[in-house]
Amino acid sequence: MRTSYLLLFTLCLLLSEIASGGNFLTGLGHRSDHYNCVSSGGQCLYSACPIFTKIQGTCYGGKAKCCK
């Protein structure tokens, strides 16, 4: 009996997260900007991009540049 209450409580918490905006599930399926930069052949640098490379985006939440 105690197990069924625990299961019901867990289910209610999960459904309340989904209904309230889904902060719990928002990050699923989203790639970080660092991952997108490196997988497209770039590199994340805090300093200026080297010669013959261009800024293609940002890394680490806009704190660094993606140079490619």
Swiss-Prot record:
Sorted keywords for this record are:
Antibiotic, Antimicrobial, Defensin, Disulfide bond, Membrane, Secreted, Signal
Q: Which family would the database say this protein is a member of?
A: Belongs to the beta-defensin family.
- Entry keyword Cytoplasm: no
Q: Where does the protein end up?
A: Secreted; Membrane
On subunit structure and binding partners, the annotation says:
Monomer. Homodimer.
Q: Which domain of life is it from?
A: Eukaryota
The residues that cross the membrane are none
Query: What's its job?
Result: Has bactericidal activity. May act as a ligand for C-C chemokine receptor CCR6. Positively regulates the sperm motility and bactericidal activity in a CCR6-dependent manner. Binds to CCR6 and triggers Ca2+ mobilization in the sperm which is important for its motility.
What protein name does the entry list? Beta-defensin 1
* InterPro entries for this protein: Defensin_beta-like
Question: Example GO biological process term?
Answer: calcium-mediated signaling
Tell me which positions the record assigns to the signal sequence.
1-21
Q: State any GO CC term.
A: microvesicle
The record's section on Gene3D superfamilies has: Antimicrobial Peptide, Beta-defensin 2, Chain A (3.10.360.10)
Q: Per UniProt, what is one GO molecular function of this protein?
A: identical protein binding
Propeptide, chain numbering: 22-32
Q: Which residues pair up as cystines?
A: 37-66, 44-59, 49-67
